[in-house]
Curated annotation (Swiss-Prot):
Organism: Homo sapiens
The protein's name: Cysteine protease ATG4B
Family: Belongs to the peptidase C54 family.
Molecular-function GO terms, alphabetical: cysteine-type endopeptidase activity; cysteine-type peptidase activity; endopeptidase activity; protein-phosphatidylethanolamide deconjugating activity; scaffold protein binding
A GO CC term attached to the entry: mitochondrion
Effect of S34D: Phospho-mimetic mutant; increased proteolytic activation of ATG8 family proteins
Motif (LIR): 388-391
Lineage of origin: Eukaryota, Metazoa, Chordata, Craniata, Vertebrata
Outcome reported for the amino acid change (mutating S316D): Phospho-mimetic mutant; reduced hydrolase activity, leading to decreased proteolytic activation and delipidation of ATG8 family proteins
Amino acid sequence: MDAATLTYDTLRFAEFEDFPETSEPVWILGRKYSIFTEKDEILSDVASRLWFTYRKNFPAIGGTGPTSDTGWGCMLRCGQMIFAQALVCRHLGRDWRWTQRKRQPDSYFSVLNAFIDRKDSYYSIHQIAQMGVGEGKSIGQWYGPNTVAQVLKKLAVFDTWSSLAVHIAMDNTVVMEEIRRLCRTSVPCAGATAFPADSDRHCNGFPAGAEVTNRPSPWRPLVLLIPLRLGLTDINEAYVETLKHCFMMPQSLGVIGGKPNSAHYFIGYVGEELIYLDPHTTQPAVEPTDGCFIPDESFHCQHPPCRMSIAELDPSIAVGFFCKTEDDFNDWCQQVKKLSLLGGALPMFELVELQPSHLACPDVLNLSLDSSDVERLERFFDSEDEDFEILSL
C-alpha cells in the first residue's frame, strides 16, 4: 500500500505546472499579483500557507485505530489548512512569510504544533476524527465540508491561546447581529483539563511565556465559515463571479471543497482556474524534537500550486473568512453588500442584520450542537447526499 502510494505521489509531483503566461491577475487570499512582475512573490505567498497532507506512521487514533489517513482524511486535512490560515492571520499576520532554513518566531511553531499528528494537539487528525465520532462519523469515514467545519468549531473552544469566535452560517444566511454578539462575548477556557500539563503546553498551541487569561476583550477574532451548495451536480455559472470575489477580499481564508470524495483547499484563482493546495500526498508523520522544534519543510508547498477549472468544482463547499477586529468585520460586510451589484452574478449567501423571522432563532452562545443537529446539517450540505436545496437556479 505504501509503495503504491509513494509511486502515485511521485507522479503527482512531476505533473505540477507552472503558472500560465497571462495578463490576468493572480489572486491569493486577498492579495493581487501579476504573473509577469511578481512571480516570486506569488510562489512565496503560496509556500507560506501551511500545507497539510496525508501522513503515515503517526500514533494510532484512539490508541488502536488507524496510523495513517491515506484515502480518507483529505477533507480533514483541508479543514486543518483553512483553520491554520486563520491562526496564522491571528498570531503572525497575513503578510508573514515562511522562508526555508530561516528562523521563525515562536508563535509560528505554536501554530504548527496545534496541528501535529498526535492526540494532544488541538486540531490534530486525532482530535478531528475522534470529535467526529460524537457527531456520527466513524473514524476513517469521509467528511463533507460542513461536517469538518462543525468539528473544528467545537475544537476551537479548547484553544484559549487563540481565543477565536467561530461562527458557522447556516441556511445560506449570515446574521450580523449574531456575530457581533458572539465576538463581544468573553468565553472562559472550556478545556484546561483536556490537555497536558503546563510543561507541555508549548507543544499544543501555547507559546512559552504566553499569557492566557479570561479578561474580557472588546472583540474576539472571528472565523466565519459558510457551508454552501452552489448547484445540483455542477456549480451554477451564475455563482462563479461571486466566488472569485471572495478570494479578492482581504479577510479571505479560502474555500474547502473539490470533487466528490476528493477534497482540496482553494486559496485563489487566475482567469477561469482555481488555485489550490492538494492534500493527496502521503508523507511520514513528523514528531517535534525535545525543544518542541518541528522539522517544518514538509508543511509548506515548495512547488507551483495545483490549478483546476472553476467549472469542475463540486458545488458543495465551505467559504472561510477571518476578521481580527470589528472594523475588519464591518469592512467585510460592506464588501459583501457590494457583491449584489455585480451584473449577472448571484449572491452565494444572504447578509442580514437580524435573524429572519422564518428561521428558528439559534442560541449563538451555545458552542456545541447535538448529534441530531449535525446529522441534519450534514445531510443538507454534504455532496454525497442527494437531498439538498438548490440556490437560485
